């Protein structure tokens, strides 16, 4: 539990730019994706509340049933906020935005609403492709929110392989 508190504090420091970071290339951020995992995999996107902070990371993992079930390399991070007129305002935080991203955001909003989520201000993490894996959690209980893994430690290498290879190595 203390590790979760430390991870939350680090995420706060990184999101508020209290700690400069240039090593995001080696981090895998794992998110709980219970009800949305099928949509996430199909559309190669994960969304989260815009107000949640996060540290720099290049890889995203989807967690369900005591295991990371899919991982992908992030290609774009885009926020979408509904203004007072009901229109979406986009901000590209990383990468570039294509029309396909806007279409996927609209699909995510509809999908999220059908599950009871209030989709007015979200951050969308687009990955090149999610690859199936089975990276089992070794600690008791589900992670509370986000977990960050240093892939150089997990894979015991300084050279991160392509995502498909990594997914196989983690399984």
What positions do the PLM features span?
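Charged, terminal alpha-helix-loop-beta segments
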Residues: 1-171
């Amino acid at each position: 539990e203390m590790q979760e508190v430390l991870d939350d504090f680090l995420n706060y420091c990184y999101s508020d730019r209290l700690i400069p970071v240039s090593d995001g290339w080696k981090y895998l951020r794992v998110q709980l994706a219970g009800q949305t995992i099928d949509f996430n995999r199909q559309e190669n996107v994960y969304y989260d509340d815009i107000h949640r902070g996060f540290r720099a990371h290049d890889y995203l993992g989807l967690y369900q049933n005591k295991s990371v079930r899919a991982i992908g390399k992030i290609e774009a991070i885009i926020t979408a906020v509904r203004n007072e007129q009901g229109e979406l305002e986009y901000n590209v935080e990383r990468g570039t935005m294509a029309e396909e991203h806007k279409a996927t955001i609209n699909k995510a909003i509809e999908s999220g609403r059908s599950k009871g989520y209030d989709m007015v201000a979200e951050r969308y993490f687009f990955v090149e492709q999610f690859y199936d894996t089975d990276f089992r959690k070794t600690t008791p209980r589900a992670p509370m929110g986000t977990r960050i893994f240093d892939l150089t430690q997990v894979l015991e290498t300084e050279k991160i392989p392509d995502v498909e290879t990594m997914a196989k190595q983690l399984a």
